[in-house]
A protein has these predicted regions:
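Extracellular glycoside hydrolase catalytic/binding regions
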Residues: 182, 187-190, 201-348
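N-terminal signal peptide c-region/cleavage motif recognized by signal peptidases
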Residues: 7-9
Length: 450
């Protein structure tokens, strides 16, 4: 019966007339997104991962927009100070049949404000870390915290002391293909239904099943199919993915995304941002080469900050630029302290990236370091539309050679001071040959030749 329902759902999905205004895979180059019928490169950074819970949301979104940002992450998370949970609480216990209207008002307001600014939202339905350790102790889904079910009825644990990679919370094994725990699943579905009640009304939302999951792939599969079916009922098309925990893109976890485009219409490669330097680039390019069909690869969490241990500021900047020059569909600085968020330094790099990509048709370009010679590891990176335009990113000062033999003889060259978000004056350069490029001074630089 379940198999028959899947077939019917797939047939119905294929009959949906896709609204061209909705965020969807770009028809001309499916490694990117389009929104409102136009291709979009998604760039972002923010102070938190669950922005709908913060008090100064409008001002934060305005700041993001002012520096060229158009992309935010939205974990459906409730664990931080000042957050509210999604269910109603009475005398110390939650009722999973009653909503906390404050939570949903915040969520709806967030969707409205981002829509008004054409800021794309990537929802993570299940905020993994809300369901482990101290956060599970206060979570409404913990049987001790609600009036709806008991430990005996659900086999859910009272205490989960381990890290999520140990997958010791049965909450994530409720789906029919695993424990088939219908009592728990009923309320999980109720929560997802309420998310979709609000989000499906908007055209700027992407859906990721989890944050850094290590659980059975049947969990993500169930929710991807569930969300797709609900969207089908609403006669809209949605884009779905999963975010795995492994920092190695070639771990079997990530194969569950690569190998199932019917479930996951895009990929999230955020965990590759634990890699550094040339390896960060090489792994991403190898991962891209394995995509069949080609799909957008998002990078919703770019780690790297002097304040934490996932790399320093320099790593964060480099990862951001390598992601975009490497053909990723999105790049967003992770929240502090693990990332640069939307702090002053992140704002400069966001502004500079938008300045550069507004002056090159990035959607017609491909990564192409083969044009570069006399290049050391991690010295420079190129993205190009051969014969028309090429951009090169330098993480640090230096000199490399670029082969312009397939470009016209008369070209212009212009340097972008990334740290200052400032273009230098254009100069002429002759194509048809190999040309040396030397950064004007220290720091991060990009050069545009066309």
């Amino acid at each position: 019966m379940i198999g028959l329902l899947k077939v019917v759902a797939c047939q119905a999905l294929s009959q949906i007339s896709v609204d061209k205004n909705r965020i969807q895979v770009y028809k001309e180059n499916p490694q990117y997104w389009q929104h409102k019928s136009e291709p979009v490169l998604l760039l972002g950074g923010s102070v938190e991962d669950n922005l709908f819970q913060i008090p100064n949301l409008k001002e934060h979104l305005d700041l993001l927009q002012s520096v060229g940002g158009n992309y935010v992450r939205c974990t459906m998370s409730c664990r931080d100070e000042g957050n509210v949970w999604q269910f109603n609480e009475v005398e110390g216990l939650y009722n999973l049949d009653q909503w906390n209207e404050e939570f949903w008002q915040r969520f709806n307001n967030f969707l409205r404000l981002t829509a008004e600014r054409d800021i794309i939202v990537q929802i993570e339905v299940w905020a993994t870390f809300d369901y482990y350790r101290l956060n599970w102790d206060i979570n409404p889904f913990n049987p001790k915290n609600n009036v709806n079910y008991t430990f005996a009825q659900t086999n859910l644990p009272e205490v989960v002391d381990s890290h999520p990679t140990q997958t010791e919370n049965n909450f994530f094994w409720s789906v029919p293909a695993e424990n088939n725990q219908r009592i728990v699943l009923k309320y999980q579905e109720k929560f997802v239904d309420q998310i979709l009640f609000y989000s499906l009304k908007f055209d700027h939302v992407l859906y990721c099943m989890d944050n850094e999951t290590s659980v059975t792939p049947e969990w993500g599969k169930f929710w991807a199919e569930y969300i797709q079916a609900k969207a089908n009922d609403a006669e809209v098309n949605v884009e779905t993915t999963e975010m795995w925990d492994s920092h190695n893109l070639f771990h079997t976890q990530h194969q569950n995304t690569l190998g199932h485009p019917e479930l996951y219409s895009f990929c999230d490669a955020s965990q590759n941002n634990h890699q550094r330097g040339q390896k960060h680039w090489d792994n991403a390019q190898k991962f891209r080469a394995q995509l069949n069909p080609v799909r957008p690869i998002n990078s919703v969490k770019i780690y790297g900050s002097d304040q934490y241990h996932f790399g320093d500021d320099q790593d964060g900047f480099e990862r951001f630029w390598r992601n975009v020059f490497g053909g990723m569909a999105s790049a967003r600085f992770h929240r502090p302290p693990s990332g640069l968020g939307l702090g002053p330094l992140a704002c400069r790099h966001l502004k500079s990236m938008r300045m550069l990509t507004d002056n090159i048709h990035i959607f017609s370009c491909q990564p192409n370091n083969h044009l570069l010679s006399n290049r050391r590891e991690n010295q420079a990176y190129a993205i190009t539309n051969i014969g028309k335009e090429v951009a090169v990113y330098f993480p640090k000062s230096g000199t490399i050679d670029i082969d312009l033999s397939l470009f016209d003889a008369d070209l212009t060259l212009q340097w972008l001071n990334i740290n200052q978000s400032e273009w230098l004056n254009q100069m002429s350069v002759h194509g048809g040959k190999v040309v040396a490029l030397t950064t004007p001074s220290q720091g991060h630089w990009a050069v545009l030749i066309r």
